[in-house]
């Protein structure tokens, strides 16, 4: 009973975090076009990706038109993976910087234009680890395996919460700075308006005095 409860808890937590750290996509790309996919990754997180151009005719080799170039970069412009004129490939690295990482695909230019179908699987954190490779020989080892996976999942959730808190603080600081600038701009606008109104008043007063209206 305990083992079933533990397994259920593990699965629920694992599914909860999987939606945030895993992308399995299928998309289309025309010849000569570029499409980018982003993933928000925190520093020191392991990330792996695998991409494949779908062969329209599996009985024959892929045509030359079904080639792509890919470049994976961080928000700071650092390149973590680059490949030219390939049908498939994979990448794996540990993120040094926190932020949005971009995987940009470019289909080779071809006339007439063709449409490529691409399968892309991008996993980060717990999902990047191949848990299926762990051998299980007895009930004790099964429980140990589940506990390890649960610990990894909880740690990943904990790190994700701290990361989101840091991003929230950054946004709050940005909002405070923006509000402060807007306040100073409002005061400056008010000062300019009062100055212009004062100059208009002096000008009109002088004008009417010369005309002996007042």
Swiss-Prot record:
Annotated SMART domains: EMP24_GP25L
Pfam hit, one: EMP24_GP25L
Coiled-coil ranges (or none): 164-177
Membrane topology listed for this record: Single-pass type I membrane protein
Omega-N-methylated arginine sites (modified residues): 167
Cytoplasmic side: 203-214
GO cellular component terms listed in the entry, alphabetical order: endoplasmic reticulum membrane; Golgi cisterna membrane
Signal peptide boundaries: 1-24
Lumenal side of membrane: 25-181
Motif (COPII vesicle coat-binding): 207-208
Gene Ontology biological process: protein transport; vesicle-mediated transport
Motif COPI vesicle coat-binding: chain residues: 207-214
Quaternary structure (record): Probably oligomerizes with other members of the EMP24/GP25L family. Associates with the COPI vesicle coat (coatomer). Associates with the COPII vesicle coat (coatomer).
Function: Involved in vesicular protein trafficking. Mainly functions in the early secretory pathway. Thought to act as cargo receptor at the lumenal side for incorporation of secretory cargo molecules into transport vesicles and to be involved in vesicle coat formation at the cytoplasmic side.
Family classification: Belongs to the EMP24/GP25L family.
Name of protein: Transmembrane emp24 domain-containing protein p24delta9
Source species of the chain: Arabidopsis thaliana (Mouse-ear cress)
